[in-house]
Amino acid sequence: YEGADKLYARQMWGSTTRCYDEGVNENGMGAANMERVLDGVLAEAKGKKFIMLGAGQIEYILHNLVSVFDVPGDVIEMGCNIGVTSSYIQRLLRRAKIGKTLHVYDSFEGLPAKTAEDGATPCDKGASAVTEDAFRKTFKDLDLPWPVINKGFFGEIADDNYPSQICFAFFDGDFYGSIMD
C-alpha cells in the first residue's frame, strides 16, 4: 500500500486486531484453543493462490469472523461464486464448534447488468457465472456440510431468507446495485 491507502490499511488492521483480541477472549473457547483452530484453517490456505482473492484476504476475513464469535447470530456471505471463501468460513465455524450457521446468497447466474454507478467496469452481465452444483461440489470435495444456500440476485431474495440475527456479513458483490440491494 502507498500513501493514504497505507494509512487506511494500517488503521483497519489495528482496529481489526483489537476486535479480534476481544472476540477471542470473550467467546468462551479460550484464546489458546481459538488460535489453534484458526491457525489450522489458515494453514490450509497457506501458499495457495486464489483466483478471486488477493494475498492475505482469507486471513483477514477469518480474523474478522473470529472477532465476533461472542456476538449472537449467524454468518452470511453475499456473493459466493464457487465457494472458496465460503468453504474457509465453514471450516472455521465447524472446527470452532460455536453453533453458528453459514448462509450464502448468490444468483449463480453471474453478475447482474451494470448501471451508470459502475462506471467503466470491464465485466458484463453474466460474467463469473458458476452453477449451484459447482458450488456444492466445492463443499463435497472438502467433506464439509453445505451452508444454507439462497439463490437469487440480492434485491430479489425475501427478507425471510435471512437469519433473524447476523453476527458477521461478508459482502462480495461486484457492482454498485448488488451492494445497495
Regions found by a protein language model. Name each.
Residues Y1-V24:
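N-terminal auxiliary segments of SAM/dcSAM-dependent transferases
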Residues R18, G23, G30-A55, L62, ...:
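S-adenosylmethionine/decaboxylated-SAM
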